A protein has these predicted regions:
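Alpha-helical transmembrane segments in multipass membrane proteins, preferentially the mid-helix core
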Residues: 2-3, 61-62, 107-156
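Internal transmembrane alpha-helix with an interfacial aromatic "cap," most often the third helix
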Residues: 2-6, 26, 30-45, 49-79
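Structural signature of transmembrane alpha-helix termini at the membrane-water interface
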Residues: 3-7, 26-37, 60-64, 87-94, ...
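Membrane-interfacial loop-to-transmembrane alpha-helix junctions, especially the N-terminal start
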Residues: 8-21, 72-77, 137-146, 189-190
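Hydrophobic alpha-helical transmembrane segments of multi-pass membrane proteins
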Residues: 19-34, 150-153
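Alpha-helical transmembrane segments of polytopic membrane proteins
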Residues: 44-56, 112-126, 165-175
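Membrane-proximal helix-loop-helix units in multi-pass membrane proteins
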Residues: 62-129
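C-terminal transmembrane-bundle signature of multipass membrane proteins
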Residues: 136-190
Length: 190
């Protein structure tokens, strides 16, 4: 929130919301570095590992939005019990790299590559920890946006066997929403 304007976005007065948004912005940056290093195995692997770690962090950022410390602590502990063994397993048995799909999307080969059943179960659990805090805190816009993104991800996975590569759409849509809210709604309707 800029100190030089009378219009403020109340949603962004929480440091955890900034961290939550930054997780999407950083993912866009990491994907850029994967794209420019797609043919360099070392850098491809490094940036794919960073993308994987950021994906692991996103539900934590979402859980931190919860105001009730008891619920927050319970969800964080549950998520860590799930994600730590899965992360060790993924990093131990798989070569982390990305490639270009048949429709020219970025394919994170470590995400869904060996056992689809367990990968889908893992994705559903990840999704619960990512979306439940938005529902619990009644962040309706964020929850609706998350569900819309889920539908697009599902369609993209069905069509191209890729699940990521939509971060720039997500970030730009969020920023367009906040720009319209700040520049059009607040000055004329508040």
């Amino acid at each position: 929130n800029n100190a030089y304007t009378q219009y403020k976005i109340d949603d962004l007065n929480n440091v955890y919301r900034y961290i939550f948004f930054m997780s999407f912005i950083l993912m866009q940056l990491i994907e850029y570095f994967i794209w420019i290093n797609i043919k360099n195995p070392l850098y491809n692997s490094i940036f794919t590992a960073l993308a994987t770690l950021l994906l692991i962090f996103q539900p934590i950022a979402s859980i931190m939005l919860i105001s009730d410390n008891t619920v927050k602590k319970m969800l964080l502990q549950s998520y860590l019990l799930f994600i730590v063994p899965l992360t060790i397993y993924k990093f131990d048995i798989q070569i982390l790299n990305s490639s270009v799909s048949k429709l020219n999307h970025l394919r994170w080969n470590a995400m869904f590559s060996y056992n689809y059943f367990y990968d889908i179960i893992g994705f559903i659990i990840w999704l619960f920890f990512f979306l439940f805090p938005l529902f619990y805190e009644r962040l309706t816009f964020a929850l609706m946006f998350g569900l819309l993104t889920l539908m697009l991800v599902t369609y993209n996975y069905y069509k191209d066997d890729t699940i990521g590569s939509m971060w720039c759409w997500i970030v730009n849509t969020i920023m367009i929403y906040y720009a319209a809210y700040l520049l059009l709604y607040l000055p004329f309707f508040k």
